[in-house]
Structures are given as structure tokens and as C-alpha cells.
């Protein structure tokens, strides 16, 4: 018998996944984020070496390799081939590490998984919450936090899974269309 119940929280960039996860954490549930694990994975020597070969412009340092994630982001969001190359390499590692951590926690565990559908990992979770938000709000949110211009944000949105065109009827869809209090209520009602 399983000791835990894994719940993925996913959605496009700027949809409010991290805010939803934060609300869930404030409600006392254990949470994990693939973004946190990504930062850990980027520190591993083997990963840095491989990324330095894949993205030579992102490599800094000679003795101790460092990788500039902003340079990688710029490259991958302007080239579908580079994005696929990066995703094919990193996503399985990040997902494996995240699931390994999640399985050590008993009870309900909420895991933020930005690329859930892109890496076809739906079957790894007992339940999936898809956070959706209107396009203009997503663009404004990402521009405010990331110092990107509208075209760059749209480039990233267009490189991701098409949540608006997909059949999400078998998942729990959380519409982030109001203020924080409204979102908190929706999260409480959903979980």
C-alpha cells in the first residue's frame, strides 16, 4: 500500500502555479517544486559539464564551471531544437529527483511540475491540478517578475504545452482569474 498521494500542480508560465503551491504550503501540506530541484541539479558537475558542451556561450569559469541560466534561456526560447535538446536532457533528471524526494513524504504531497505534459509524466501522479489564467494576466505577471518584454514572454508561452487547446476534462482545473483571496478560496475548495 502506498504511503503517499502525489498531486501535481502544473500550468503555463505566469499562470500562478507557484502562488497556488505557496497557498497549499500555508495550509500545512508538504510541497515540492521542480524549480527548486532544478537549482540543485544545475550544481552537479556532470550536469554542468554537459550543459557547457550543449551551450558553450553559457559557460563561465575555467577551473570551476558555472552555467549562466539566462544565456541558456535566451537560446532555448528562440530555438525549438535547443529547447528540445535541453528538455530531453534535464527533465528526466529533474523529475526523477523530485519524485524521489516526494515519495519519502507521507500523506498528500503537492508537487509543482511546470513541464508535466511536455514530459508526459501524468501517470506518475495520483491527481493533477492545472492552473489556468488569461493570457494578458500571464504576460503582465511574467514581465513584472522577469524583466522580459512582451515578445519574449509570448515566445516562452508559445514554446509550452497548449493548455487552452487541450482537453483537460480529466484533471482538476483551477482558474486563477481574481485576487489572492479568491485564489485562496478556490485552492481550499479544491484540496
Walk through the language-model features, giving the residues of each.
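Hydrophobic anchor at the beta1->P-loop junction of P-loop NTPases
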Residues: 7-9
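P-loop (Walker A) phosphate-binding loop of NTP-binding proteins
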Residues: 12, 24
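ATP-binding Walker
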Residues: 15
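Walker A/P-loop
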Residues: 18
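Post-Walker A helix-loop "phosphate-sensing" segment adjacent to the P-loop in P-loop NTPases
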Residues: 25-34
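NTP-dependent small-molecule kinase module
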Residues: 100-108, 122-131, 135-149, 158, ...
